[in-house]
Regions:
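Transmembrane alpha-helices and adjacent helix-loop boundaries
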Residues: 1-163
Length: 163
């Protein structure tokens, strides 16, 4: 389900129910929406990481007398975690970009504040500042991801492990 649809459904639908005890804060529902959407993304990344570990790794651990849980804990999961770090950082970059979507609820975040300032001053440089802020966060994260991938590739080649 698209992120904006989840934000709209929860951000407008939940407060409209009028049920006592349910928060009506738009910021609360914006955060809940982003958490729900990105939890689904992250769980898929981890699932793919676990499935990417060759079944022979589990079989070798089981042949050494490890239980299924021990095999997962000591053999499969550590290998999977190494493989999922770059995709997780990509998801984090996507999350940082998707925060601008919460403005549809009226929550004032960076892009919405930029629109307010630009409308008041008729000065387009506010958009330049907002873009610079997004770029200043995104580019270092992208470089970190590239560095981690290159480091992992180098370690695998040094160990003679096929990628």
């Amino acid at each position: 389900m698209p992120t904006i649809l989840v934000i709209l459904m929860l951000g407008t639908g939940m407060p409209a129910l009028g049920v006592e005890g349910i928060p009506t804060s738009q910021i609360f529902w914006a955060v809940v929406s982003l958490v729900l959407v990105y939890t689904a993304y992250v769980s898929e990344v981890y699932r793919a990481g676990i499935e990417s570990v060759h079944p022979s790794q589990d079989a070798a651990a089981r042949s050494l007398g490890l239980t299924h849980v021990q095999s997962l804990r000591f053999v499969v999961i550590p290998q999977a975690v190494r493989r999922v770090i770059p995709p997780l950082l990509n998801d984090f970059i996507g999350l940082q970009k998707d925060t601008a979507l919460v403005s549809v609820l009226g929550v004032v975040e960076v892009l919405r504040q930029t629109q307010i300032n630009e409308a008041a001053a008729f000065n387009g440089t506010y958009y330049l500042v907002a873009a610079t802020l997004f770029v200043a966060i995104t580019i270092p994260l992208a470089r970190l991801t590239d560095w981690l991938v290159a480091r992992d590739r180098k370690r695998r080649q040094a160990a003679g492990v096929a990628t």
